[in-house]
From Swiss-Prot:
It holds the Pfam family Tektin. Keywords: Cell projection, Cilium, Coiled coil, Cytoplasm, Cytoskeleton, Flagellum, Microtubule, Ubl conjugation. Residues 21-84, 268-308, 336-383 form a coiled coil. It comes from Bos taurus. Microtubule inner protein (MIP) part of the dynein-decorated doublet microtubules (DMTs) in cilia and flagellar axoneme. Forms filamentous polymers in the walls of ciliary and flagellar microtubules. Microtubule inner protein component of sperm flagellar doublet microtubules. This is Tektin-1. It is found in: Cytoplasm, Cytoskeleton, Cilium axoneme; Cytoplasm, Cytoskeleton, Flagellum axoneme. Residues 399-418 are annotated as: Disordered. The gene is TEKT1. GO terms for biological process: cilium assembly; cilium movement involved in cell motility; flagellated sperm motility. GO terms for cellular component: axonemal A tubule inner sheath; axonemal microtubule; microtubule cytoskeleton; sperm flagellum. Belongs to the tektin family. Its main location: cytoplasm.
Length: 418
């Protein structure tokens, strides 16, 4: 108990002074450290504030640059999309032209086939593989070749339109994405420290797994632009090709059409000349038939006319056989009567022979008449087929090129016919 009530030990004055000095020094040191910390803190605050302002300014600048870059590419894509849309619209018109041109060649093909079919109805010697038939066959081959070429070109045009639409889809998708990106970056660029809708978000400092590098981003848009340019250039090339094909095919058909029509004209002239010559020969044969018929009448009359003298001579000879006795003499009169009978018999034989020949010739002339009439009919049939059935039907050739400008393929007017 005595120890508990014992007063604490007292320090020496020197110890007291040392203890106070230690407190002074520690307080001074603590204050000094605190002042330095305050100064350092202010410097740090100023530095960080400056750095933050600089970073935010740099971010704003980067956002602005990014906006300019995205807007630049958006404009590029817009321009390419507009060009591609125009090119596709043109190709759709060319597609329609090709379809109409292909359709328009069906009638000329039908006409050519009908002409060949009609000309198969020529008969006899006129069923000849003449120049008209050769040129019609060539025209048929040209039209078939043209239709094959137009069909193939139409397929190429449809495929090019499909490729254009694919490129257009990629451009539109890229444009939508860029529009969204511009909208987002515009919002980000407009934000400041006093914006009401700023807030903390969790886990924002990360790299999205589906994000791409700037090089990939540039390559993506550049690839879309290059593809659009390629398809547009292909479209322009195809348009020029279609123009050439439509012009050349129409020109080829028109030229062959002219050749065929010239062949028809020459063939008709030749056939009509042959018919006229046959008709001339028929007239001469008819005249000769009439002459021969008259000749036969004359010969028959001449034979008939010999009957009287023959009967007289025979009667005289028979009567003179009744002379009596020595009067039955072979005198000059007897010999002359015998000679007369022989002459008449011989002459009648000659007349009958000539009459027989005349009948033979008349039959020959009649056969020739029938042959000439049949041949003339054959020629008339050929002329009818070519002049009445074929030539008028061909006036609707050549076909239109499928354009809506009222012109024929190749640029000639619709009333122009081959």
């Amino acid at each position: 108990m005595a120890k508990l009530l014992q007063q604490p030990p007292k320090f020496l004055r020197a110890e007291w002074q040392i203890a106070n000095k230690n407190q002074y020094h520690r307080a001074e040191a603590q204050r000094s450290r605190s002042e330095r910390l305050v100064a350092e803190s202010q410097r740090l605050v100023d530095e960080i504030e400056k750095t933050t302002r600089k970073s935010q300014s740099d971010v704003n600048k980067k956002l602005e640059q990014r906006l300019e870059e995205v807007r630049f590419w958006k404009k590029e894509l817009d321009d390419k999309l507009e060009q591609l849309v125009y090119a596709t619209e043109d190709l759709l018109l060319y597609q329609t032209r090709l379809q109409k041109a292909l359709e328009s060649f069906k009638e000329p093909l039908h006409i050519t086939e009908k002409c060949l079919e009609y000309r198969e109805k020529r008969v006899g010697i006129d069923l000849v593989h003449d120049e008209v038939e050769q040129e019609l066959i060539k025209e048929h081959e040209i039209i078939r070749g043209v239709m094959t070429l137009l069909t193939r070109t139409l397929e190429e045009t449809c495929e090019q339109i499909r490729l254009n639409r694919s490129a257009k889809y990629n451009l539109e998708k890229d444009l939508r994405d860029k529009f969204t990106a511009i909208t987002i970056d515009d919002i980000c660029f407009s934000l400041n420290n006093n914006s009401p809708n700023i807030k903390y978000s969790e886990n924002v400092v990360r790299v999205e797994p589906n994000s791409v590098s700037l090089e990939d981003w540039l390559d993506f848009s550049n690839t879309n632009v290059e593809k659009a340019d390629k398809q547009r250039n292909n479209s322009l090339t195809l348009k020029a090709l279609v123009d050439r094909i439509l012009f050349q095919t129409a020109s080829d058909l028109r030229r062959q059409c002219d050749v065929v029509d010239t062949a028809f004209k020459n063939g008709l002239k030749e056939t009509k000349d042959a018919r006229d010559k046959l008709a001339l020969h028929l007239d001469k044969v008819m005249e000769e038939i009439a002459s021969q018929e008259k000749n036969i009448v004359v010969l028959e009359k001449a034979i008939l006319d010999q009957e009287g003298p023959a009967k007289v001579a025979h009667t005289r000879l028979e009567t003179r056989t009744h002379r009596p006795n020595v009067e039955l003499c072979r005198d000059v009169a007897q010999y002359r009567l015998i000679k007369e009978v022989d002459e008449i018999t011989h002459n009648v034989a000659r007349l009958k022979e000539t009459l027989a020949q005349a009948h033979v010739e008349l039959k020959g002339l009649n056969r020739r008449q029938l042959a000439l009439q049949e041949e003339i009919q054959i020629k008339e049939n050929t002329i009818y087929i070519d002049e009445v059935l074929c030539v008028p039907m061909r006036k609707s050739i050549p076909p239109r090129d499928g354009d809506d400008h009222g012109e024929w393929a190749g640029g000639s007017h619709p009333e122009a016919v081959c």
